[in-house]
Amino acid sequence: MAAQARAITLPTLPEPLEACASQTALVVIDMQNGYLSPGGYLDLAGFDVSGTPPVIERAAQVLQAARRAGLMVVHAQNGWSPSLAEAGPRRSPMWHKSNPLKYMRAHPGSQLLIRGTWDHAIVEALQPLPHEPVVHKPRYSAFAGTNLEMMLRAHGITTLVFVGVNTNVCVETAVRDAFHREFFAVMVADATLQAGPPSVYESSVFNIQKFFGWTATTADMVAFLEGLAAPGAEAIAP
């Protein structure tokens, strides 16, 4: 069921955000084994992934509620083809700053965030439905080198709700880029997880609320979206 074309007020901070249901989309960022699972890229790179199970659960709750409410859903999936052509050579800053690329150079034969591998795959609880577009992104931002903006504009989307990982890297970068492209951006903060100490999560929340968009909690967003859903509507399991 498509979202209804009516004015809504999202339960956000630092203030409620007015939007239109039919012009609002959920963007799920990088919910992949590499970022969320033991033995994945982030774990191998030395980051703490012990906090991922509740984040997966909360992101899945938002996803299911968005589906019931009829919102457009887009999944962003980070990685590269086996040739690593999109990653760039030494002259690219990505070559120097990408942790998975650095790990693979130090461990020949390893395959992190390579399309078709377990590391690149989206976790079971957040699997896209057949009609939900997947944006394959080669950089931190879901807008960089992808067709995301074109697709959102074509569908008349003006407001974006974000869940996913990592708060301070790919999610915040997407929120910033959305702001600079004149989208209203909302991060469901507790449905994201940072790469690094809790302080970087707090910094991202501060930055977004003060400069680039709005934040919400999973409980508030799910309750709101459930209110938009048609009576008796059920989420479609992946």
Residues covered by each model-derived region:
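Short glycine-rich, polar/acidic loop-and-turn segments at beta strand-coil junctions
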Residues: N33, A59, Q77-W80
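Catalytic-core segment of enzymes that process non-peptidic bonds
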Residues: H75-L84, R90-R91
